[in-house]
Amino acid sequence: MSNVYDKAHELKKAIAESEEFSALKSMHEEIEADEIAKKMLENFRNLQLELQQKQMQGIQITEEEAQKAQQQFELVQQHELISKLMEAEQRLSVIIGDINKIITEPLEEIYGNPEGQQ
């Protein structure tokens, strides 16, 4: 039987060589070269992080904060590079989610599938 760590490294390499990863990396490089896009994305991600931390601490997000986040999201989506980056992130996220489902299937045999998904 092959070593699972070797397989994990093969998977890492396959992800790094995938079209989806290459597209994401390329979009990051383009945004790094565009100061406006870089700053917009940075501000948006900082706001996201701030709100996530509040939620994790059990602090209620105000209506004003929710509106600000929505406005920031709409603003960054209007920027072509950032919008493309988010699409690339989503595509890679789907792949990683699918891979996660596949590699956790053996655990479902032991613990069952609480989500009832296949």
Curated annotation (Swiss-Prot):
Pfam families to which the protein is assigned, alphabetical: Com_YlbF
Annotated InterPro entries: Com_YlbF (IPR010368), YheA/YmcA-like_dom_sf (IPR023378)
Coiled coil residues, start to end: none
Similarity remark: Belongs to the UPF0342 family.
SS bonds (residue pairs): none
HAMAP family listed in its UniProt record: UPF0342
Protein name: UPF0342 protein BpOF4_11360
